Structure formats: structure tokens, C-alpha cells
């Protein structure tokens, strides 16, 4: 029970949609002869485990079975597609090989202890990607360079604020403001040929694409409350981005219209 709750809530923290969390967790439970009933919410997860006999579609619950229930709060962490893939792979390994609980825990901890990608490399790649978006949308090279610099400063601030556990939406507001303000300075002093494109591209790295996608997938999979919750979270992030960008526009007397 303890392992399954930690396994499931870890998946939530790294950006896995609800249906995949339920399927992966159920797969592991079946490998050890249990049938889970899982309820997921925005902040916690509840699970009930019932022992079953048999295998596959012919399993049944004994009359003297005593289900056990537990609840655990979701963990908080950044999106991590490596964890997403490895945790899913762990569920298949468990289903096919039936390892001991000690081995399963060891493999789980090995995944969690995987060192993250170098933060400076991530910072450079995201800045480069945002610059590429600016050029792709028709911006000039100078505008792209300002977007690179603005994204670098904004994302660096976001990394530092996240390390200090600053309120999430405030972090987004400040990051959007810093990134757009750096780009706005280039527009204010006439260095950029396409300032509107540059300003629009400067905050693209903050767009919550995964929450939007997961929210829609949850709704389509029937997890309507979870989907709405994720979509509302994504909308709040977009509102925070808008606030940060609006402060820049008002401060520098610029407009996107």
C-alpha cells in the first residue's frame, strides 16, 4: 500500500495523466495479487487494496478478504518525461518478472535518485528554443537575440524562486515580467524591427502546455474533476503570464495591438 501510494503520487508530480497513473499502479498491484480502487484528487490520492485469487480475467475476491485503505498527498516537482517513461517501464517490469518488494523499492529509488539535467544546459536550450520561436514567427535576428537574453534572465529567476519555494503563481508573474521587460527595453529603444513578435515570444517558455493536454485527456478518459482541476491550474498560469507581461507593457508604454 505504502509503495503504491508513493509510486502513484510521484507520477502525478512529474506530469502523468490520470488514466496512465491508474493503469500503471493497477498493473503493479495485479502482479502481487491485489485489486486496487483508486481515487485521485488535486492534492491527494486515496487507494483501497483488496486481495484477489486467480489470474487475469478469472480472478475473484475471497469472501474473507480484508481490504486496506490509505491516503497520501501528491508530491510537488517539476515535469520530468524521463521519470514518466521509467516509472511506466517499472510497472511492466514488475508485471512480467514479479520481483521482491525490496527489489521493487530499490529500482524505484534508483529512478528517483537519477541526477537531473544540468540546470545551465536547460537554461541555454530553453533560451535557444524561445529565440527560435521568435525567428520562426517572422522576427529579425536582433529581436531573436533579445528574446534569448530575456528568456535566459526570466528562466534563471524562475529556477531560483522555485529553489526557494516561492508561491508558484507569483513565480510565473515575476518570470514573465523579467523576460518581457528585457525584450521590451530593446523595443523601447528601437533596436528591434518586430517588437510585437519579440514580446509575444518572450513568455512562450511559461505556457503550460502539459497541464492543458493532461486536462483534456483526463476529461476524455472520464476523469472529469481531475481534468477540470488541471485546466483551471493551466488557466491560472496563463493569467499570471498575462499579469507579468501587462506590467511590462504599462511600465514601458508599449502595446501588442
Task: Tell me what each language-model feature is.
Residues 76-143, 233-242, 253:
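Alpha-helical transmembrane segments and their cytosolic membrane-interface
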Residues 2, 15, 19, 77-84, ...:
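Electropositive phosphate-/nucleotide-binding environments in soluble metabolic enzymes
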Residues 1-99:
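Soluble N-terminal domains of membrane-associated systems
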Residues 107-111, 154-165, 211-226:
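C-terminal ends of transmembrane helices
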Residues 115-189, 193:
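Core alpha-helical transmembrane segments of integral membrane proteins
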Residues 187-257:
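Generic detector of multi-pass transmembrane helix bundles and their immediately adjacent loops
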Amino acid at each position: 500500500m505504502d509503495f503504491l501510494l508513493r509510486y502513484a503520487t510521484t507520477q502525478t508530480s512529474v506530469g502523468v495523466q490520470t488514466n496512465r497513473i491508474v493503469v500503471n499502479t493497477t498493473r503493479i498491484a495485479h502482479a502481487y495479487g491485489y485489486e486496487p480502487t483508486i481515487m485521485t484528487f488535486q492534492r491527494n490520492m486515496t487507494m483501497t487494496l483488496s486481495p484477489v485469487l486467480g489470474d487475469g480475467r478469472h480472478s475473484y475476491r475471497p469472501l474473507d478478504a480484508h481490504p486496506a485503505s490509505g491516503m497520501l498527498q501528491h508530491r510537488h516537482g517539476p515535469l520530468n518525461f524521463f521519470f514518466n517513461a521509467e516509472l511506466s517501464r517499472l510497472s511492466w517490469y514488475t508485471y512480467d518478472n514479479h520481483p521482491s518488494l525490496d527489489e521493487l523499492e530499490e529500482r524505484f529509488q534508483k529512478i528517483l535518485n537519477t541526477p537531473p539535467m544540468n540546470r545551465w544546459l536547460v537554461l541555454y536550450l530553453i533560451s535557444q528554443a524561445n529565440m527560435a520561436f521568435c525567428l520562426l514567427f517572422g522576427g529579425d535576428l536582433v529581436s531573436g537575440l533579445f528574446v534569448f537574453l530575456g528568456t535566459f534572465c526570466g528562466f534563471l529567476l524562475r529556477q531560483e524562486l522555485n529553489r526557494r519555494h516561492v508561491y508558484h503563481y507569483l513565480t510565473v508573474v515575476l518570470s514573465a515580467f523579467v523576460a518581457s521587460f528585457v525584450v521590451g527595453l530593446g523595443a523601447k529603444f528601437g533596436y528591434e524591427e518586430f517588437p510585437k513578435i519579440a514580446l509575444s515570444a518572450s513568455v512562450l517558455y511559461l505556457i503550460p502546455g502539459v497541464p492543458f493536454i493532461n486536462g483534456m485527456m483526463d476529461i476524455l478518459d472520464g476523469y472529469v474533476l481531475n481534468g477540470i482541476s488541471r485546466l483551471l491550474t493551466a488557466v491560472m498560469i496563463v493569467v499570471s503570464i498575462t499579469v507579468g507581461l501587462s506590467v511590462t507593457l504599462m511600465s514601458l508604454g508599449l502595446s501588442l495591438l
